């Protein structure tokens, strides 16, 4: 997961980069560091992630951090929420700048995965997904906390009924249907 000075990889910079290694459904190692963007962090970015200029002032720049990050992830599959439209674009930009080549790791984006597996959710932000699974959102929008939150959500989504298969009622086993209710859509059963 990345925290940045803004949403455009062309104009903005990474200010925090984190990853977790997972083996047998357990986090076995972590990588996390703040990054000095060598520019002022806009107020809007600090409002989202809480990272200030003072916090990054004595931290290494991306040229120092990126090789360490890539050594940590190696050729592993990267998993992130909105990784396709956000994180990978920053990683590709930095790799191109530093090495003249791109990051070639395969990756899984949990945002479209959540839309497919959990169509009943009104929103599919990482914090919404975590709330759906009753996972703590403490520290949200800090890179390491988001990595841990996303790993838990990913594991739980893998256990969801595959898209296209019928969801069954846990009480009676009948097939449930998506219904519209007073407070929005929900999955309901009339069999018990």
Regions found by a protein language model. Name each.
Residues 174-178:
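Short functional micro-motifs and their immediate structural scaffolds
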Residues 162-168, 185:
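Short metal-coordination and nucleic-acid-contact micro-motifs, chiefly zinc-binding Cys/His arrays
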Residues 2-92, 96-105, 119-141:
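Conserved non-catalytic scaffold segment of RNase H-like nuclease domains
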Residues 142-156:
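Acidic, divalent-metal-coordinating active-site segment for phosphoryl/phosphodiester hydrolysis
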Residues 104-115:
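A short, structured active-site edge motif that brings together acidic residues
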Residues 169-172, 189:
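Short cysteine-rich clusters marking metal-coordination/redox-active sites
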